[in-house]
Amino acid sequence: GVPCKLIQSMDGFRFWNLSEMRYFLRYLDKRVTTPVIPGELWEEAKRATSKTYARSQNMDLVKRCFEQFEHLNQTKYISDFKEFVFESSMEDFCDVSGSEVVVSTIHKAKGREFDDVYMLLTDNYIKNAELKRRYYVGITRAKNRLFIHTNGHCFDRLTADRHDRDDRSYTLPEEIVLQLSHRDVYLEFFKGIKREVLALQSGDRLQYRDFTLYTEKTDLPVAKLSVRMQKTLNDWFAKGYRVKSATVSFIVAWKPKDAPKEEPETAVLLADLTLTR
């Protein structure tokens, strides 16, 4: 019952490649005739994007992108806007106001500060300089109080107001959510189904069968899990979990890094898988 926000990130892709942003940029490119975006065209493009992606759960992020650019630029140059979007990440537009709890990785919390910080750290990482820098970033997010929960001994020698040891064993959660990235889907599978993928929007429900995701209404295959993700799922299946549901998280533009410049981009579907036991 506690108001909570998750600071999401886009592992493996830029905010620039989000389908909602690509639609807005294409709308402008087809109609703008001067370096400055006319106010009427800017508002028209926003309305068209909001209408086309009315059911998308990513539109709040997109609208905050518009608002931030408007706040920073009274005169809207198309080149400035493209640079602004290209250099932005999803974390830049996550609104955590009004949330009593903010859930985030250390990397995504960089640049933010909180009254109280709870760090959950496992001991299965190599203790190198990079890890120490990451821990430092997490520790320095706290303005008042810092709580570190760990199964390792990295912090044993540090002075603290309180040390507690918990020897209890905890069962696995009844439900988990796996957020798929580019590494978790078979990218070549998306070639040839761009129209079908672009017909979907963030939040749309999908069907899962045999490591493949299908549209709920037409039962068309729109994503196939990678070998890496299939192994991950099998590990969870062995622990008694099953896939309860799947939903579209992002639709993004993608093409291989070594692809010729003239090769068209592919629309890639990234989903959230909810597992229960």
Predicted feature locations:
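Core RecA-like ATPase module of SF1/SF2 helicases and allied nucleic-acid translocases
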Residues: G1-F147, G152, D156-S169
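Conserved active-site motif detector
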Residues: D156-R277
